[in-house]
Design a protein with these regions (language model features):
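Beta-lactam-recognizing serine transpeptidase/beta-lactamase-like catalytic domain environment
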Residues: 1-171
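Ligand-recognition elements built from short beta-strands and adjacent flexible loops
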Residues: 130, 172-277
């Protein structure tokens, strides 16, 4: 069995229990059990996250270290400070290296496991076809009247992309969601997926078909990329958009506008509207 000393050592190495040092006021330390007062019950509950308190930025800092090869860095909000009139950089901020906490080989194993969570497990609602995403869902009872609520939850998902060489990490937490099944994979993972879709364009992340293939169920709705048909004649556009529901209007034979635009994602067999001119 994992002993409390080793568990708490790794928890603290990951940055929990102390402020991250982010350039943001009001940061908290979080709450951990005192090692001297930690019994078998506290050891067990700490292992799955009950009885302790951590901040969202601590979560991001820790997971970033786990997936970047094992190095813990101080997070920051502002990369460069600019002179407003000339846009000259007057101060730059670089992440402080706090040390290596795990081996690269361990980091690679965890990344693969977390990619599997999205492709085959509880994080499947964050999956994007032809892109590699790793992540972990969370479903935590909220504290109420000195104990844990049986009906109120914090639903979360923390994920990263690409799973094999991360460029972005996303943490989503939703407290006391209404009218939905109370699971992080149901509520938070789809929100993270939408953020990843935007990040693909912003960061110019290329498709990668070498990842773990998704296990689809009848509940899944597959998303596909809309081809860019602007400038094509209508007959050619129809061939390219085969499999989509096409609606078009206007006078002429050439596509002058397309919605959704080429490169966007829609549900399989979704509708594409064309304007002709």
């Amino acid at each position: 069995m994992l002993q409390k000393e080793k568990l708490m050592s790794y928890i603290k190495k990951l940055g929990f229990g102390t402020k991250t040092g982010i350039d943001l006021n009001g940061e908290g330390n979080g709450i951990l059990f005192n090692l001297d007062k930690m019994g078998n019950v506290e050891l067990a509950t700490t292992a799955f996250g009950q009885g302790i308190s951590v901040t969202p930025i601590q979560q991001v800092q820790a997971v970033s270290a786990i997936i970047n090869g094992g190095t813990l860095y101080t997070p920051f909000l502002v990369k460069n400070y600019l002179e407003p009139e000339t846009n000259t950089i007057i101060k730059s901020v670089n992440a402080q290296n706090k040390g290596t906490i795990i081996k690269k080989e361990t980091s690679d194993l965890v990344k693969y496991a977390l990619e599997s969570v999205v492709a085959k497990g509880s994080g499947h609602n964050a999956y994007i076809e032809n892109y590699r995403i790793g992540g972990k869902t969370g479903t935590a009872q909220t504290v109420e009247n000195g104990g844990y609520s049986s009906s109120k939850y914090i639903l979360s998902f923390i994920g990263f992309m690409p799973a094999n060489d991360p460029e972005i990490i996303v943490y989503v937490a939703v407290e006391n969601a209404k009218g939905v099944v109370q699971y992080g994979g149901t509520v938070a993972a789809p929100i993270a997926r939408n953020i990843f879709l935007s990040a693909i364009d912003i960061l110019d992340i290329k498709p990668d078909t070498e990842g773990i293939p998704k296990e689809y169920t009848w509940l899944d709705q597959k998303y596909v990329v809309v081809p860019d048909v602007v400038g094509m004649n209508i007959d050619e556009a129809k061939k390219v958009l085969k499999g989509f529901n096409i609606e078009y209007s206007g006078n002429g034979e050439t596509v002058i506008y397309e919605s959704p635009k080429g490169g966007m994602y829609v549900k399989e067999k979704g509708t594409v509207v064309l304007m002709l001119g």
